[in-house]
Amino acid sequence: MPAIEVGRICVKVKGREAGSKCVIVDIIDDNFVLVTGPKDISGVKRRRVNILHLEPTDKKIDIQKGASDEEVRKKIEEAGLTEYMKERIKIKIPTL
């Protein structure tokens, strides 16, 4: 089970969307993936993200590589994960 794969639900840990959940839609290269919220569910816009800024969860939805936001939204609703996707995670910054 690879951690970074199409359909994997992740939490963004860096940036203005830190704490929001997103879905990996496409793997661009070894360092970057394409993610989406979709925006109306979790607030994450479709964009390229460094994999070091993501924390994978144990949940995965069955989508095709490059799926549209509508397809992702439908699969999230079918899996019953809408409320899970709307939850925000509190990111803890380690202190020295």
Curated annotation (Swiss-Prot):
One of its GO terms (molecular function) is RNA binding. SUPFAM superfamilies: Translation proteins SH3-like domain. Keywords: Ribonucleoprotein, Ribosomal protein. GO terms for cellular component: cytosolic large ribosomal subunit. It comes from the Archaea. GO terms for biological process: ribosomal large subunit biogenesis; translation. The keyword Endoplasmic reticulum does not apply. Belongs to the eukaryotic ribosomal protein eL14 family. This is Large ribosomal subunit protein eL14. It comes from Saccharolobus islandicus (strain L.S.2.15 / Lassen #1) (Sulfolobus islandicus).
